[in-house]
UniProtKB/Swiss-Prot annotation:
Upper lineage: Bacteria, Bacillati, Cyanobacteriota, Cyanophyceae, Synechococcales
Function: Catalyzes the synthesis of the hydroxymethylpyrimidine phosphate (HMP-P) moiety of thiamine from aminoimidazole ribotide (AIR) in a radical S-adenosyl-L-methionine (SAM)-dependent reaction.
Protein name as catalogued: Phosphomethylpyrimidine synthase
EC number: 4.1.99.17
Pathways per UniProt: Cofactor biosynthesis; thiamine diphosphate biosynthesis
Length: 456
């Protein structure tokens, strides 16, 4: 779809959506997003220029259907997939991608760390994906030197980052905000550093006793990104891994640096979103969202969860969806899903489905709470179908039609029950929606009550 859009841009020094927007040029991607979000094209261009909205769209991802992440657009959901040294293969990851897209993932991150050829699995995912693909390049940087931190050089990091851009990755998590002076602040935490990328860079800094190379070479990374229109997803290496560690000095020190890096990227006209926690008590979620907006000049916020309790292994998709809905309500632009396997193992296809549906609910609830135009239309349509016992319409409008139909049919599988004015909960005699009271009857009752009040 995008080949004809991209062709005139080839060879230019800066092909980012932000660069075009700041120069007053409405790209085809901006126009596409405007129609998708039912917003004026001029607003999309203005928000991209300001940095409050991003359109992750690498010029080498030609089958991409552009989408937006930002406060002006719908709250989005990301799904993580990826092979590990202990499980999965390329075909399984491609199937997870297709399943994620089927159940509504707005973006997908390939977090493969080994067990497969990382370049091949990434290329296969990008070729099959109509949604933006994100990656974490430090994983492959470490894998490229067979896990030897002492052999990992600054140039190795940049080489892998550019390789991901060349393949068509739309956004990359860059852990540039973790500084060597932040590391002592981790003392006193229960779970220390829980970010894999952050852990790799912490080890690198401790081993070499040098500053984070992603920070010192940040301008070089910007130069790479603007050639491909790859978007920064600034990683939160010091995100809290438990409630005890939430909103501590380590997390907030890194957040301040992430704000500095956001503005540095904008000087290059490179798009940015900022990643956030993690594990956060409910009463601290609003503070975390507001603090990010303040420190990062309202760049889109992208949070993992957050989980609101630490005692829900096997059900972390529920614990985190509670936090995600609140974060979305307060202004977070994208929610990274958590599956039932979080903290326990590599998610399979069913885990991907469970996590995505939980997060589509959270994002949709946030859009309703923020009074986005049309956000509740589908809810109202389903409610009318429910009141009229239109079972097939109810299934169709559900976030997971297959699951809704499956649960209904467990007790009433015959087709005749798709027209029945009851379900197996109340049966045919006790459903309160069966005895419908007409508006005319209610008006007559109202008149009689008013007469009684008047005569009294």
């Amino acid at each position: 779809m995008r080949s004809s859009w991209i062709k005139p841009r080839l060879g230019k020094n800066n092909v980012t959506q932000m660069n075009f927007a700041r120069n007053g040029y409405l790209t085809e991607e901006m126009d596409f997003v405007a129609k998708k979000e039912n917003l004026p094209s001029s607003l999309i261009m203005e928000e991209v220029a300001r940095g409050r909205l991003i359109i992750p769209a690498n010029i080498n991802h030609l089958n991409l259907e552009p989408m937006s992440i930002g406060i002006a657009s719908r709250c989005k959901v990301n799904a993580n997939i990826g092979a590990s040294p202990n499980a999965s293969d390329i075909n399984e990851e491609v199937e997870k991608l297709k399943l994620a897209v089927k159940y509504g993932a707005d973006t997908v991150m390939d977090l493969s760390t080994g067990g497969v050829n990382l370049d091949e699995v990434r290329q296969a995912i990008i070729q099959e994906s109509p949604v933006p693909i994100g990656t974490v390049p430090v994983y492959q940087a470490l894998e490229s030197v067979h896990g030897s931190i002492d052999r990992l050089t600054e140039d190795d990091f940049l080489h892998i980052i550019e390789k991901h851009c060349q393949q068509g990755v739309d956004y990359q998590t860059i852990h540039a905000g973790l500084l060597i002076e932040h590391l002592p602040k981790v003392k006193g935490r229960i779970t220390g550093i829980v970010s894999r990328g952050g852990g790799i860079l912490a080890q690198w800094m401790l081993h070499h006793f040098k500053q984070n190379p992603l920070y010192t070479r940040f301008d070089d990374i910007c130069e790479i990104f603007k050639k491909y229109d790859c978007t920064f997803s600034l990683g939160d290496s010091l995100r809290p891994g438990c409630l005890h560690d939430a909103s501590d000095d380590a997390q907030l020190a890194e957040l301040k640096t992430l704000g500095e890096l956001t503005r540095r990227a904008w000087e290059h006209n490179v798009q940015v979103m900022v990643e956030g926690p993690g594990h956060v008590p409910m009463d601290q979620i609003e503070f975390n969202v507001r603090k990010q907006m303040e420190e990062c000049s309202e760049a889109p916020f992208y949070v993992l969860g957050p989980l609101v309790t630490d005692i829900s292994p096997g059900y972390d998709h529920i614990s985190s969806a509670i936090g995600a809905a609140m974060a979305g309500w307060y202004g977070t632009s994208m929610l990274c899903y958590v599956t039932p396997k979080e903290h326990l193992g590599l998610p399979n296809a069913e885990d991907v489905r469970e996590g995505l549906i939980a997060y589509k609910i959270a994002a949709h609830a946030a859009d309703i709470a923020r009074h986005r135009a049309g956000a509740r239309d589908r809810d109202d349509e389903l409610s009318y179908a429910r009141y009229n016992f239109d079972w097939n319409k109810q299934f169709e409008l559900s976030l997971d039609p297959e699951r809704a139909k499956q649960y209904h049919d467990e007790t009433l599988p015959e087709e005749i029950f798709k027209k029945a004015e009851f379900c197996s909960m109340c049966g045919p005699k006790h459903c309160p929606m069966n005895s419908k009271i007409s508006d005319e009857s209610l008006d007559q009752l109202k008149d009689k009550l008013e007469e009684c009040n008047t005569s009294a």
